[in-house]
Amino acid sequence: MKQLKRKRKSNFSVQETQTLLKEITKRKEVIFSKQLNTTINVMKRMAWEEIAQCVNAVGEGEQRTGTEVKRRYLDWRALMKRKRMKANMKLVGSGFPLPTSDLDDSLTEDIDEKIAFRNDANFDWQNVADFRDAGGSLTEVKVEEEERDPQSPEFEIEEEEEMLSSVIPDSRRENELPDFPHIDEFFTLNSTPSRPTYDEPHLLMNIEKQKLELEKRRLDIEAERLQVEKERLQIEKERLRHLDLEHERLQLEKERLQIEREKWRLQLVSTEKPALENELGQGEKSMLQPQDIEAEKLKLERERLQLEKDRLQFLKFESEKLQIEKERLQVEKERLRIQKEGHLP
């Protein structure tokens, strides 16, 4: 099986490590953010890439990547923890009154920084040369196919916050750090706000504002659409009311015609009664003549009612057609208005 070829890079110099620590403190709010989402992860990756660019600007010859500077920082943190544990063990061995609970905490790498750095002048945390004594595996960066994922659990937020606390030294040792002249930046992190180095938050805010504006416009259009729907329902209600009124009018007209018909029948009966009394001797022809007249009148009345019914049906059809045309024009007007608003900036 063919082995993977490994390419070793040179160790980080003192100047590169000091630049790395300074750039990390400038980006504290982003790198050690407790928020967990895609945007924050992207901002963290960009922050490490910017730190790598600052380290490369030192001009030591090696081109570092964001993953390499992040791994270097984790190795530096691990070395500081081991040195802190050794210092605590020395304090315990020399008779320093360290409580048992603090000793347990030191063994679990959670001891207080003030105890960890107390009375140990030889524990020079910024002495980057100590990395060479800690083993080459901490400083060698191997370019392989199986590279560690920067988003793996070893980069958890709690570990990164502890890492930051390891960077900040005791203020009483400020004058003992000649290799790190800008160490005062570590003291003022909590008292002075750091200068914003990213435009991403402003960009995100602008994107959110645009989203809110689009959502507001969409809600306005939805409200107008609901208003149009409400008006359409109101028009439909009015149309149904008119149809009911028309139905009632037709019913009244039918009753009126019924009354008219009854009246005509009574008139015929009253006019035919004397004729029947005076002409009892006439034949069958004279008796059937009034019945023929009545049948003819009923036929004419029926035809007139049918014509009236057809006329009303035609008017109803025309009314519905006009109503549909009105609604179509209203919908077309609304579509043109929405299209016009959609082209606005």
Swiss-Prot record:
Ranges for the region named Disordered are 141-175
Task: Note whether Phosphoprotein occurs among the keywords.
Answer: yes
- Where Phosphoserine occurs, the residues are S106
* Assigned keywords, A-Z: Coiled coil, Isopeptide bond, Phosphoprotein, Ubl conjugation
User: Cross-link named Glycyl lysine isopeptide (Lys-Gly) (interchain with G-Cter in SUMO2), where?
Assistant: K9, K114, K142, K237, K254, K273
Spell out the Pfam families in the cross-references.
Myb_DNA-bind_5 (PF13873)
Q: Which residues does UniProt call coiled coil?
A: 202-344
The terms describing its cellular component in GO are: nucleus
* Modified sites of kind Phosphothreonine: T188
Q: Which InterPro entries match?
A: MSANTD4, Myb_DNA-bind_5
Give yes or no: UniProt keyword Cell membrane. Answer: no
Q: What are the transmembrane regions?
A: none
Q: Residues in domain Myb-like?
A: 4-77
- What name does this protein carry? Myb/SANT-like DNA-binding domain-containing protein 4
Q: Which organism is it from?
A: Rattus norvegicus
Gene transcribed to yield this protein: Msantd4
